[in-house]
């Protein structure tokens, strides 16, 4: 039994460049409209620390419109998850430019008290933004998917109500940050964890529902659509040699010729999405009684066209595959 969760990381670029209007507000509005068309719920992973700093520093007048959009999405039944890039926590905005602390790029590598401060700030911002003093996020996604070393961050997040994480993508690795999700490949469609997010633990307190991935030849990832998205960032050069160097740097994290391809409706072509879903359905036919949560991912900053996500939702509707949220799925996982 397949249940698909459509998630979007709701944020601007990680170095602070780009406008809220172009990278968050407008793409999210069109995505919400597309979800409404197909009557599907959405999970928005809101980069709360980023927005808190933008509001505090008065860096972008569109922040009020973003907050209004979040409130409307929340009131309309979409799920709001917590997403944190800690380099924003004490960021400053001077002369039209953000100065972020990239030494604090991985939340999990910060001192315990620092993690507490960052998470507290993020949750308080969300309560105020949603005008709901009782708001408690059920679901978390780590910035840049960095959720190792898992403790003490997991315990702190648990204390704030987090019961589901969706940071892992099977086969993923970030050598620079000491993150390795390759051992999660055989963990199943979801699992409980505590000490290490990639290690299944029967009595774990948090459930991991990973971003769906499949291992593919690295060369198959170099498509015109992905390259166009990379070009759109202000910190990627447009010359061909630089593009190739950028991709090679990504693949240095892997010792084989296989690369984990996320189910990413911003970066995948219609054909890639179709093939991925056909494989998932084929696998489900072997054990239709088994619950198989499938997490698709996108980023507002990457949402340049809507043909792929519209096709994905159409495909799911045609094949009568349920689209849900983490919150709605949670009772079935206990």
State each model region's role.
Residues 41, 48-146, 204, 208, ...:
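Metal-dependent polysaccharide deacetylase catalytic core of the NodB/CE4 family, i.e.
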């Amino acid at each position: 039994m397949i249940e698909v969760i459509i998630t979007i990381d709701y944020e601007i670029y990680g170095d602070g460049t780009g406008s809220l209007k172009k990278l968050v507000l407008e793409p999210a509005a069109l995505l919400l409209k597309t979800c409404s068309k197909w009557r599907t719920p959405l999970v928005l992973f809101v980069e709360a620390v980023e927005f808190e700093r933008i509001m505090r520093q008065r860096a972008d007048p569109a922040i009020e419109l973003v907050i209004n959009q979040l409130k409307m999405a929340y009131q309309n039944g979409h799920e709001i998850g917590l997403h944190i890039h800690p380099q924003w926590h004490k960021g400053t905005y001077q002369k039209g430019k953000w100065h972020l602390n990239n030494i604090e790029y991985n939340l999990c590598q910060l001192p315990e008290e620092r993690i507490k401060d960052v998470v507290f700030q993020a949750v308080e911002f969300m309560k105020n933004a949603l005008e709901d003093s009782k708001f408690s996020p059920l679901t978390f996604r780590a910035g840049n998917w960095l959720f190792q070393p898992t403790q003490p961050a997991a315990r702190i997040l648990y204390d704030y109500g987090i019961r589901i994480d969706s940071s892992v993508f099977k086969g993923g690795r970030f050598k620079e940050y000491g993150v390795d999700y390759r051992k999660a490949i055989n963990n199943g469609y979801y699992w409980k964890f505590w000490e290490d997010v990639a290690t299944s633990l029967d009595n774990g307190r948090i459930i991991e529902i990973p971003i769906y991935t499949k291992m593919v030849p690295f060369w198959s990832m170099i498509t015109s659509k992905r390259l166009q998205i990379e070009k759109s960032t202000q910190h990627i050069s447009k010359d061909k040699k630089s593009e190739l160097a950028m991709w090679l740097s990504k693949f240095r994290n892997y010792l084989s010729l296989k690369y984990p391809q996320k189910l990413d409706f911003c970066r995948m072509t219609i054909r890639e999405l179709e093939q991925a879903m056909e494989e998932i359905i084929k696998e489900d036919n072997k054990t239709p009684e088994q619950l198989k949560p499938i997490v698709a991912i996108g980023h507002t900053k990457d949402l340049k066209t809507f043909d792929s996500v519209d096709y994905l939702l159409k495909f799911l509707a045609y094949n009568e595959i349920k689209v849900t949220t983490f919150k709605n799925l949670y009772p079935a996982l206990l």
